[in-house]
UniProtKB/Swiss-Prot annotation:
Record organism: Borrelia duttonii (strain Ly)
GO CC annotations on file: cytoplasm
Record domain Lon proteolytic: where: 636-816
Protein name: Lon protease
UniProt keyword Oxidoreductase present: no
Binding site for ATP: G398, P399, P400, G401, V402, G403, K404, T405
Assembly and oligomerization: Homohexamer. Organized in a ring with a central cavity.
Enzymatic class: hydrolase
Keywords noted in UniProt: ATP-binding, Cytoplasm, Hydrolase, Nucleotide-binding, Protease, Serine protease, Stress response
Induction: By heat shock.
């Protein structure tokens, strides 16, 4: 607002005040400024508090406030201004539509001011710009009416004058005047604002000065609520000192920046002079030397088409940029990436591929896993016949610790090419895979281009780990990027955001790993050859420990192989009672724990040269066993209890089904143990089936009409789902109904139909491994799974009697 306009509105205020005083005198009343209505419309101010005796503009944009302004202009023109609390403003900002109803008792400060609207200007975009003259301090009492706009009742607050004007107060008053003028000189503020009030009026002086200081909302409100003029003088002086400290810090920062700029300008001037001198002398500078090196590297690359043109433009730009500019570094880094990428066609030489050598490498690095190795060798043999690895995408699925990642490294050794691994577990930003655009500060290429730069070949083996743990976010969908990366039709011209050039990655052999297929999108899954890896049985773990883990751990810890021997019984104990996971990570962890303790003993007592780990002294090194036989195997089984077999993403496990009966007026079944919908349906099917054959079982109908059957599966915190517990649940109901105990060491798995047919299930190998680990001797499985049973290695099946069934009636014959 221009100074002439301010002076004009100031004259309007003075005229209005003069008229009001004359009217007050004629009426015999004593009014300092205007009438003092106790009921006034309220306008909530979001920013800082407003003080009395000030002339300020306020922008009105909300419909509620505009209605309040229109209303008071038709009347006495008096409104009240109260400041909103920060808590309400934060809630309003976090609200999705940005609108919240104001609770005037809680959301505004209790002390505000009354003000007279002097002028209203309509804004082009809607809303008003009003100019008000603030009058008195008031305290919010209550809301009287809140229809189109709030009308509140207020109490007028009287300031407490100074009773005794002593030397201290005089010093404070003088300091306020002095510091205010000092701030004016720094801020270059117009001094006419001080002439709005009588300077001798200490209370008004405090209000005017506080209103001009850029302090916090809380500090301003504290001054507004201070009725004692004496206390208000002290608070305002504190604010003035804070303001001057802030000005001093700002000036210091500005001075530092100015000195830095002057130094940079001086350096630039000197560098330009040096550059001119070098040019006159014919001496080539460092930048020119760097440009020539970069150009020679790029000329040696096999660039074509779009890549050749784009890199040429970047090289030309590089020649003109100054070394001190930020863009110089960006362009140089980009060109260095270009020179480090394998633009030449470096395909794997499949003519030199030897199947026997490949088999030896896989056998050397991984024990057992015959089925997996065969699948890998078959897959690579096809690539040899095609003499190309284009479109080679393999997905290894299995529990943690079974060797998925290390198999990827072995495949790279088989193909005699480089290996690069990166994990996408937890990645939510597609830029991690496809790179950031160069416009961003600190931009980098994605993992694919980084891998090619590191391996320096365009036909490496890339292992993308933990693909099932990718998640989408507002930063993009990494799965969609992986579709582009893995699609043979698209990855011929893969375009990284940072590189921004087409790059052929079709010769890359992609291996992906996952613990589960459930979270992987079907379109992505269809592009891959899926190979399932199951967990290890105890015999395999012990053999792997002897051949691979123990030598590795001894070497890592500096212990000689003759200084420590493991008895077979100790390794069996570790496998069965300490490391029951399907992989080998826990097994290796316990071996490391033992070797570290032996290393300490060898250092402490050098007279003992060798130690032996046996079943008897194992607890001394790794503590008490983590696992024992399942509790229900240690105790006698009771009627209604049956052992089932389950499968998870991390391998198989045994599952106990418990049932009990209680007399109830509402017979039926009650299910607990955190069962999923499919398992609940299986329980209902089993209950209905057992009820339908109750006559054949010679079970009295009253069993189903009189009792509530409660079915529970222990470990209630663990979610359980799937149809494969159908025959197990039915067997539990039958055992309970006949009051007979199921034969010991019997486990079962199979889906049950409503008519009593037993249908195929999945995860058979993992379930058998879990059963064997827990000492199960008899397993009932669906006859439809015979093919799966035949594929399972004989060492896993040894010691277990398998009973293949087609119907529930065959299961019943095997129960007791």
């Amino acid at each position: 607002m221009k100074s002439r306009e301010i002076e004009y509105f100031m004259e309007e205020i003075k005229d209005t005040v003069s008229k009001e005083k004359k009217r007050s005198k004629n009426s015999g009343g004593i009014l300092p400024h205007f009438d003092k209505p106790v009921r006034v419309p309220l306008i909530a101010v979001p920013s800082h508090p407003v003080f009395p005796s000030m002339f300020i503009p306020i922008v009105i944009v909300s419909d509620i406030d505009m209605k309040a302004v229109d209303y008071v202009i038709k009347g006495n023109g008096i409104i009240s201004l109260f400041v909103l609390r920060d808590k309400f403003l934060e809630k309003s900002g976090n609200n999705k539509d940005g609108k919240l109803t104001i609770n005037y008792q809680k959301d505004i400060y209790s002390v505000g001011v009354t003000a007279k609207i002097v002028k209203k200007i309509n804004l082009p975009d809607g809303g008003y710009n009003i100019f008000v003259s603030t009058i008195d301090r008031v305290k919010f009492v209550k809301v009287v009416l809140n229809e189109d706009f709030p009308i509140i009742e207020v109490d007028y607050l009287k300031q407490i004058p100074i009773k005794k004007y002593d030397v201290n107060l005089k010093a404070i008053y003088s300091s306020i005047l002095l510091k205010t003028k000092e701030i004016f000189s720094h801020r270059k503020m117009p001094e006419f604002q001080l002439n709005m009030v009588n300077i001798e009026d200490k209370g008004r002086l405090c209000d005017v000065v506080a209103g001009m200081i850029a302090s916090s909302k809380e500090s301003h409100q504290e001054v507004l609520e201070t009725l004692s003029v004496k206390d208000r003088l002290k608070k305002v002086l504190e604010l003035l000192y804070e303001e001057l400290n802030l000005i001093e810090i700002q000036n210091k920062i500005a001075k530092g920046i100015q000195e830095k700029l002057e130094k940079q300008q001086k350096e630039f001037f000197l560098k330009e002079q040096l550059k001119a001198i070098k040019t006159e002398l014919g001496v080539g500078d460092e930048k020119n030397s760097e440009f020539l090196k970069m150009k020679s590297k790029i000329d040696a690359l096999a660039l074509k088409g779009e890549a050749l043109d784009a890199v040429g433009r970047e090289l030309e730009k590089f020649s003109f940029l100054e070394r001190h500019s930020s863009e110089y570094i960006v362009v140089r880094n980009y060109l260095e990436l270009i020179t480090n990428l394998p633009w030449e066609d470096t395909k794997v030489d499949f003519d030199k591929f030897n199947l026997q050598r490949a088999e030896k490498i896989l056998d050397k690095t991984h024990y057992g896993m015959r089925e997996v190795k065969d699948r890998i060798l078959e897959y690579i043999s096809v690539l040899k016949l095609r003499k190309s690895q284009k479109g080679a995408i393999m997905l290894l699925v299995g529990p943690p610790g079974v060797g998925k990642t290390s198999i990827g490294a072995a495949i790279a050794e088989v193909l005699n090419t480089k290996f690069f691994r990166f994990s996408v577990g937890g990645i939510r930003d597609e830029s991690e895979i496809k790179g950031h655009r160069r416009t961003y500060v600190g931009a980098l290429p994605g993992k694919i281009i980084q891998g090619l730069r590191i391996t320096k070949t365009n036909s490496p083996v890339f292992l993308i780990d933990e693909i099932d743990k990718v998640s989408s976010s507002h930063y993009g969908d990494p799965f969609s990027v992986l579709l582009e990366v893995l699609d043979p039709e698209q990855n011929v011209n893969f375009r990284d955001h940072y590189l921004d050039l087409p790059f052929d990655i079709s010769n890359v052999f992609f291996i992906l790993t996952a613990n589960s297929l459930e979270t992987i999108p079907t379109p992505l899954l269809n592009r891959m050859e899926v190979i399932q890896l199951s967990g290890y049985v105890d015999d395999e773990k012990i053999e792997i420990a002897r051949k691979y883990l123990i030598p590795k751990v001894l070497k890592e810890n500096g212990v000689d192989k003759d200084s420590l021997k493991f008895q077979s019984s100790s390794l069996v104990q570790i496998a069965r009672e300490y490391a029951r996971d399907n992989g080998l990570r826990n097994f290796e962890k316990y071996l490391k724990q033992i070797v570290r303790k032996i290393a300490r003993k060898l250092v402490e007592d050098q007279s003992v040269k060798a130690y032996q780990i046996s079943k008897e002294n194992l607890e001394e090194y790794i503590g008490i066993p983590v696992f024992r036989k399942e509790k229900f195997l240690d105790k006698a089984m009771s009627p209604g209890m049956v052992m089932g077999l389950a499968w998870t993403n991390y391998g198989g496990s045994t599952l106990i089904i418990e049932t009990v009966k209680t007399e109830s007026k509402s017979p039926g079944i009650k299910l607990t143990g955190r069962l999923g919908d499919v398992m609940k349906e299986s329980a209902n099917i089993a209950f209905t089936y057992v009820n339908s054959i109750s006559n054949e079982l010679k079970v009295h109908k009253s069993f189903f009409e009189k009792y509530m059957i409660h079915l529970h599966i222990p470990e209630g915190a663990t979610p359980k789902d799937g149809p494969s517990a159908g025959i197990t649940i039915a067997s539990a109901f039958i055992s309970l109904a006949l009051n007979k105990t199921v034969r010991p060491n019997l486990a079962m798995t199979g889906e049950l139909s409503l008519t009593g047919n037993v249908m195929a299930i999945g995860g058979l190998k993992a379930k058998i491994i879990a059963a064997k680990r827990n000492g199960v001797e008899h397993i009932i499985i669906p006859k439809a799974n015979k093919v799966d049973l035949d594929d399972i290695p004989i060492n896993i099946k040894n010691g277990i009697n398998f009973h293949l069934v087609d119907s529930m009636k065959e299961v019943i014959k095997l129960l007791f």
